Curated annotation (Swiss-Prot):
Catalytic activity: ATP-dependent breakage, passage and rejoining of double-stranded DNA
Record carries keyword Kinase: no
Lineage, uppermost ranks: Bacteria, Bacillati, Bacillota, Bacilli, Bacillales
GO CC annotation, single: chromosome
Domain Toprim as annotated: residue spans: 429-543
Function summary: A type II topoisomerase that negatively supercoils closed circular double-stranded (ds) DNA in an ATP-dependent manner to modulate DNA topology and maintain chromosomes in an underwound state. Negative supercoiling favors strand separation, and DNA replication, transcription, recombination and repair, all of which involve strand separation. Also able to catalyze the interconversion of other topological isomers of dsDNA rings, including catenanes and knotted rings. Type II topoisomerases break and join 2 DNA strands simultaneously in an ATP-dependent manner.
Protein's recorded name: DNA gyrase subunit B
Protein localization: Cytoplasm
Amino acid sequence: MVTALSDVNNTDNYGAGQIQVLEGLEAARKRPGMYIGSTSERGLHHLVWEIVDNSIDEALAGYANQIEVVIEKDNWIKVTDNGRGIPVDIQEKMGRPAVEVILTVLHAGGKFGGGGYKVSGGLHGVGSSVVNALSQDLEVYVHRNETIYHQAYKKGVPQFDLKEVGTTDKTGTVIRFKADGEIFTETTVYNYETLQQRIRELAFLNKGIQITLRDERDEENVREDSYHYEGGIKSYVELLNENKEPIHDEPIYIHQSKDDIEVEIAIQYNSGYATNLLTYANNIHTYEGGTHEDGFKRALTRVLNSYGLSSKIMKEEKDRLSGEDTREGMTAIISIKHGDPQFEGQTKTKLGNSEVRQVVDKLFSEHFERFLYENPQVARTVVEKGIMAARARVAAKKAREVTRRKSALDVASLPGKLADCSSKSPEECEIFLVEGDSAGGSTKSGRDSRTQAILPLRGKILNVEKARLDRILNNNEIRQMITAFGTGIGGDFDLAKARYHKIVIMTDADVDGAHIRTLLLTFFYRFMRPLIEAGYVYIAQPPLYKLTQGKQKYYVYNDRELDKLKSELNPTPKWSIARYKGLGEMNADQLWETTMNPEHRALLQVKLEDAIEADQTFEMLMGDVVENRRQFIEDNAVYANLDF
């Protein structure tokens, strides 16, 4: 029995008349990248989101509250919802059942005509038809009109007419599909964590909906996670602040509509210094911000300044806070739903609707102002926090000037310890951040000076999780990095000015090296996050061991490799093993051959796939709450490779 189907048979005039047809499907198999972005692992998972988005649309319209996603044996995907069921009556223009039109004609669906869905999610909106076209097999079961309807397809082509296969007292839709290996040549295997992260996010963004993910590929080890948040994004903010010290117990929360735009905002300040602002439009994470973010920021700054001056916490007009000051230590989520969202920007993740700015500004400012006057103690704490941030900003401005590099060609302002590369083309340039001066010397001698720059870092950099920007910019190692990268920092950050498109962290393979690596990643995440999002940050993989047998040398990168090599080698001639404790133990040639030569090296690219996990991990590892850190170490100690 399918658990997600609904007992309520409420079709509410959702029929073939609401299905609008725009164009044919022929192009989808020829040029799949145009419709789903790519045919890589990312594109494969996009197929799931296209089907899930349709179920979310039913939920947003008020007709579904349960969605189930199952990874079946052989990487089939099954998505079930308890909505009204896709219409099965004949669609007038095509003369075919509406469900068949939706699954075989590109851009045919309830989200395009305006009569079916008021608001719909999904960035591409390419819908079920493209999933069908890019699937080796697809099946649909519709529970509607007390009847179960069924149709099957191969590569988008119906195998038989829609037929009745049983009776039912439920409503809803079940779609099963298997991605076509001829199109997804890289992989057709789904990653549970990738699906889990987005499903949890969707459950937060659509409060009250229960979304279940189940992995049935291993019969003896079935995995299941179910997400249901009555608090919606309010619960999301509480989760993000879990390892922080909030300065008010409950997040400030608003959920209102104006001019057919639904606005939901949750905000909570904590004692830290980092800002964590996530924005969404129709469930799409708008990484590049947009008009909803602009309206929120404008209202926040104006209302806090107005309150600070009228309550005499701020003495004069000249004490006004900047936007950056008002957002210090703030965790906030903005989610809007719009009938016709306009996405722009480099990755189509920036909201462009100008009318949204005014609506968000008005709704949030009224609510926030009321909150401040009703909670004077919290209001004072927030304003005073902003005043402290303003003082730090003035101090940081002086320090920031020192880090400014006018352009990629500006050599005069470069830090003295930097051995820059001669190429001025950022796409081919890489900079190695090397632990210690001695290792820095070896890497400088062993590098390709045309494309590889070296910046030695002395000792551990500052833990930015516990510091304001003025203190951070007074740290010599951090200042040198900012100057070398050329991007600026914080509000001044500009990815287009990056001098290097590969920033490689190169530390010793011991506990100290791991700590320095974590400090650097914390700095990049908190103050230069676009570098990570653009895929510019890497971690070098220097060898752990050198195994010598006669004149033959083998470099080994982990214990598993070492065990494998030892089992394969002849016992004679006798071999010896040396463990590298640090980069400084390798000469220039060895460093080049094992760690820096693009032909042979292994680099780990740092990816940001789950903002919640990343934020919580950095806060827990580098923040003030010792108990959470201790628990993490105890839970993960079995995986650690400790070097005493």
